[in-house]
Amino acid sequence: MGGPGYLLDAWQIQAIDGDTIRYGTERIRIRGIDTPELAEAGGFDATQRLTRLLKDGPIRIVPHGRDVYGRLLADVYVNDQNVAELLRVEGYAKSRP
């Protein structure tokens, strides 16, 4: 797993879509993946899967700067499992550099 990051409880995190979460007012983009937008085919399913994964907390956020939209770019782990990798393997996400 990446650096120490921040350990959060599941109730503190909300899925915005399949590759973006919210912690308070902070929007966090999951690094390394892209999922369909909510209005696109597969977007709702990806968001629901991410929501279910987050409920399995605790959640570790390992920041890697910000993206072009100002969102925190981070590796996200649930119970030490990489969320991006889980979503890719399960077919909800594609790799994104």
Predicted regions and their residues:
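Small beta-barrel nucleic-acid-binding modules, primarily SNase/OB-fold domains
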Residues: 1-97
